[in-house]
Amino acid sequence: MLARIQECILYRGFSDGEILNNMAELINLYESDEEALKAKEDQFFKSINGLVELAGMYGFSGNIWHTYLTFLLVNHENAFSMASEIRGAIKGSINDLAKNDFQIFKELYDFDITVFDRVFGTVCCKVICDYQTPDENSKLFNTRIRDRICQMSKTLAAAATTEEFMDDMVSFYKDFGVGKLGLHKAFRIGHDENGKVEIQPITRIAHVKIDDLVGYEIAKKKLIENTEAFVQGRKANNCLLFGDAGTGKSSSIKGILNQYYDQGLRIIEAYKHQFQDLNEVIAQIKNRNYRFIIYMDDLSFEEFEIEYKYLKAVIEGGLEKKPDNVLIYATSNRRNLVRERATDKLEIADDNDLHSSDTVQEKLSLVYRFGVRIYFGKPDKKQFQEIVRTLAARYGVTMPEEELLLKANQWEISHGGLTGRAAQQFIDYIVGTEEEKRK
C-alpha cells in the first residue's frame, strides 16, 4: 500500500499536516525500500513525538495515530465538508472527489504502523496504538470535544468500506459541524500574522447554566424567549442586558450559550476597538450553518468616543441585507449605553451645537437598535439573603443559617453591596474556609 496523500483533491493543505506528510513518506518507503526507511530514523521519532505532544495538548487517548487522522478530517473546511454541514448527504460530482480522498485516508487507517517497531527496534508504535494520556484535562479542547473526536476515530477505524467511511464523515459534519466553528462554543476576534481578521476559539468556557442565576425570573424568561426564537430560525431581536454591576448579566449570556450550543448557537466576543472588524467577521460567518451572537460585555461610550457610530452601522446594515443567523447581544451598566449630561435633558443648546436635540437623539439611537432590553437590578436585603441561602445549599455549606446570614450581611458592606456577585464571592469564601478547617 502506498500513502497517496498527494493525490487528495479536497483534503489538502492541512494546518497540522506535518506529521501526516512525514508518516506518509515512511509508509511509502516501507513498501518500496526498507533500507532507505532505516535512514529516516530521526523523521520517525519526530513523528511519534508529534503525536504524543498532540495527544497531551488535546487530551487524546487510545490509538492516537487514528485520532490524529480524525482530527485532521473533522477540522478541514472544504467544499464537501461545509456542504455536508448544512445539508448532510449531498448530490453531484463532488461526492466522487470526496470518495477519492476518503479512500486514501481509509488506507492510512488500515495500515498497521506497528511494523515500524521492527524496523527501528522500538515499541513506540505499539504504545501509541493504545495510548493512555497522563492528564485527561485538555489544554485546547474541553472533554466534550475530545470525547467526540476519540469516538469518531474508533468509528472510522471500524468502517468496512470507503462508502461506510464516507457516510460516517458526512453524519459527523451534519450532526456536529466542521472546523473550529463546529467544534467550539465561543470565539474572540483576532488577526493572523498577515493582519487578516480571523475568528479564534476560546477553549476554556465556564460551565454556567442559566438556572444557576438565583432570582431574576422575568429577566431570564425574556432572554430565553428571544434566544430560543433565534436558534429555531424565527424572528428575534438584538438584546441589551443593562443594570447594576454584579447582578448576573454576563453570567446569563454564558448560561444561554451552554444551554443552546447543541442547537447550533455560537458566541463571538467583541470589544469596542474591534468594531471596525465586525463587517469582516460577519462575512466569514453569514453562510455557516450556525446561529451567531456577537457579544459585547460591559458596553458603554464616553462623550468623546465615536465607535458607537460604527456599531450602529453594523447593526442597521448597509445595502447588503443583515444575515438572519447573526444577532448582537450586549451587557452594560448604562441604560442608554452613551454617557448623558444633565444638559441633554434640557432644551438648552450647546454653544458649539446648533442642533442639540439632534445630538441627543443620535446618542440615544444606538440603544434603540436593541429590540429587547432587559433590566437587571440589585436585589433588596430579603432577596440577597435568599440568594445566599440558595447558594449555600447548592455548595453544601454547613454553617447555621443565622450565623451564615449575619456574616453575609457583613460581607456585602465591604464587597460591593447587595449583589448576586457579592453573594457568590461570600459563599466561595465560606466553602474555602470550611474545606481548610476539615484538613
Feature locations, PLM:
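C-terminal alpha-helical "lid" subdomain
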Residues: 373, 377-439
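Conserved catalytic/switch belt of AAA+ P-loop NTPases
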Residues: 302-354, 358
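Intrinsically disordered, low-complexity N-terminal extensions of AAA+/P-loop NTPases
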Residues: 1-157
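Conserved AAA+ ATPase "SRH/arginine-finger" region at the nucleotide-binding site
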Residues: 349-364, 371-385
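Interdomain "pre-motor" coupling segment immediately N-terminal to P-loop NTPase/helicase cores
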Residues: 133-199
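Walker A/P-loop
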Residues: 238-270, 280-287
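Conserved nucleotide-sensing/catalytic segment adjacent to the nucleotide-binding pocket
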Residues: 265-268, 279-323
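N-terminal pre-Walker A segment at the start of P-loop NTPase domains
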Residues: 202-228
